[in-house]
């Protein structure tokens, strides 16, 4: 069983989201209980002790003031799941973005080198998280996410978007398949 702790993991924030009053964070590998380089592993499909992953997810949710971290089984798509109530799943469906108007939900997008995109319309109370790698970006995952937010009452001109840390072109080779 994973060691329980009140230690909360550190996280980064995007000024634009902070100024709008949206509670959010981009978490690093630090502050979890898993072994190895990725001690804050929150991936349910990872080769890690499920009890450790659950504890890590609880720590992230607690740091955000929520009861549970909600995430998806990410597949590098443009598919968006809209939540109008708190889900009861343990492992979410295959998609790459979550949108909700339910207060208190902690939406997560897991990333390493891909982009974690957080968006909010603070007036409408609509938030979103998206996992945007090169494939999802080329499939317009962000546009699909904003469209889903609008269907819940968000207005494009009020939506603020924060981009999390991600890999840059200088850090890897891009082949002719792009």
Region roles according to the model:
Residues 1-178:
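Active-site microenvironment for binding and transforming phosphate-containing groups
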């Amino acid at each position: 069983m994973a060691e329980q702790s009140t230690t909360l993991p550190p996280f980064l924030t995007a000024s634009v989201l902070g100024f709008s009053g949206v509670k959010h964070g981009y978490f690093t590998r630090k502050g979890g209980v898993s072994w190895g380089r990725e001690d804050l592993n929150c991936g349910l499909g990872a080769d890690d002790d499920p009890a450790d992953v659950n504890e890590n997810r609880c720590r992230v949710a607690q740091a955000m003031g929520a009861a549970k971290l909600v995430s998806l089984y990410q597949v590098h798509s443009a598919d968006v799941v809209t939540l109008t109530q708190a889900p009861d799943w343990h492992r979410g469906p295959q998609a790459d973005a979550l949108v909700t108007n339910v207060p208190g939900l902690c939406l997560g997008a897991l990333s390493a080198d891909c982009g974690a995109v957080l968006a909010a319309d603070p007036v409408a109370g609509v938030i979103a998280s998206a996992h945007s790698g090169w494939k999802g970006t080329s499939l317009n995952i962000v546009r699909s996410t904003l469209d889903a937010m609008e269907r819940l009452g968000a207005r494009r001109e009020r939506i603020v978007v924060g981009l999390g840390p991600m890999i840059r072109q200088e850090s890897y080779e891009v082949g002719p398949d792009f």
